[in-house]
């Protein structure tokens, strides 16, 4: 039903897909349920909106370096509490969730809050939606030659604002994606894996405080020896060892199990 990340020119290689070091001028684009990467571009600072824009539809220009200004339209999903300048955005036609400081990033221009609001829809199967959260899955994607490619991943949570969408990440490409997974499940393109290997969550005493890494600065050593810095911005409720990380030099949101990798 969809194409995988690799099959088009300009995307990052399979070797890069498992690491955080990726060029910040690439975006993953979906056209007719196909994932691609395309370059985008930065511009001049914009005046700061005075009202809360979470849940709003927005559009803005984007210009990177000396490139042309391109126009982007999307939905603001969240404002990050540990960095209120940072917004999580789902752009139209793109599968990734992007993190941008909309009012500070010089690449953003002419930010406009649109009058149309996001339509709310009733979830078709609330029990299935709850069941798949936190589960390992196999997600089938249609390649450009019509064959199927299987991607293993984890369903992280229901997405905010767009209530029939789910956050998901993949072993081959640990960034944050959004899909309407109930549709994929019903079409046979999503399979929930048995969780016999998952240990039950540890029992907590009433009032027990569990340490969280949210708000912590992190440093990532790339294979070439260089380092990149970022911040832990979210802890996944269904899998508390899994966190979202926003690196300073990239607008993708990375998803890592920091217990396994520490």
UniProtKB/Swiss-Prot annotation:
Compositional bias segments (type: Basic residues): 27-38
Post-translational modifications: Phosphorylated during oocyte meiotic maturation.
Record bears the keyword Repeat: yes
Positions of disulphide bridges: none
Subcellular location per the Swiss-Prot or TrEMBL entry: Nucleus; Nucleus, Nucleolus
Residues recorded as bearing Phosphoserine in the entry: 109, 124, 199
GO terms, biological process: gamete generation; meiotic cell cycle; positive regulation of DNA-templated transcription; positive regulation of Wnt signaling pathway; protein localization to chromatin; regulation of DNA-templated transcription; rRNA transcription; transposable element silencing by piRNA-mediated DNA methylation
Region described as Tudor-like domain 2: 132-193
UniProt-annotated stretches for the region Histone H3K4me3 and H3R8me2a binding: 93-98, 142, 250-252
Region (Disordered): 1-49
Single Gene Ontology MF annotation: histone reader activity
Region (Tudor-like domain 3): 213-262
Function: Chromatin reader that specifically recognizes and binds histone H3 both trimethylated at 'Lys-4' and 'Lys-9' (H3K4me3K9me3) and is involved in piRNA-mediated retrotransposon silencing during spermatogenesis.
Protein name: Spindlin-1
Gene giving rise to this polypeptide: Spin1
């Amino acid at each position: 039903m969809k194409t995988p990340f690799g099959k088009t020119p300009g995307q990052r290689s399979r070797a890069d897909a498992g690491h955080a070091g990726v060029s910040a001028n690439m975006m993953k684009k979906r056209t007719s349920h196909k994932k691609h990467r395309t370059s985008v571009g930065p511009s001049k600072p914009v005046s700061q909106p005075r009202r809360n824009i979470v849940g709003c539809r927005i559009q803005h220009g984007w210009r990177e370096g000396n490139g042309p200004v391109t126009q982007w339209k999307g939905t603001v999903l969240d404002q990050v509490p540990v960095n209120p300048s940072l917004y999580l955005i789902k752009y139209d036609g793109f599968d990734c969730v992007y993190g941008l400081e909309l009012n500070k990033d010089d690449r953003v221009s002419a930010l406009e809050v649109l009058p149309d609001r996001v339509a709310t829809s009733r979830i078709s199967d609330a029990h299935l939606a709850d069941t798949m959260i936190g589960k390992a899955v196999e997600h089938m994607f249609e390649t450009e030659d019509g064959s199927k490619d299987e991607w293993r991943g984890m369903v992280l949570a229901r997405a905010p604002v767009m209530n029939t969408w789910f956050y998901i990440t993949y072993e081959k490409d640990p960034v944050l994606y959004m899909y309407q997974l109930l549709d994929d499940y019903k079409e046979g393109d999503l399979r929930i894996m048995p969780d016999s290997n998952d240990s039950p969550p540890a029992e907590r005493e009433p009032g027990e405080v569990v340490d969280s890494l949210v708000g912590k600065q992190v440093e990532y050593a790339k294979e070439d020896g260089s380092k990149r810095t970022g911040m832990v911005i979210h802890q996944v409720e269904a899998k508390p060892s899994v966190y979202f990380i926003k690196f300073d030099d990239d607008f993708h949101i990375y998803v890592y199990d920091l217990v396994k990798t520490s």
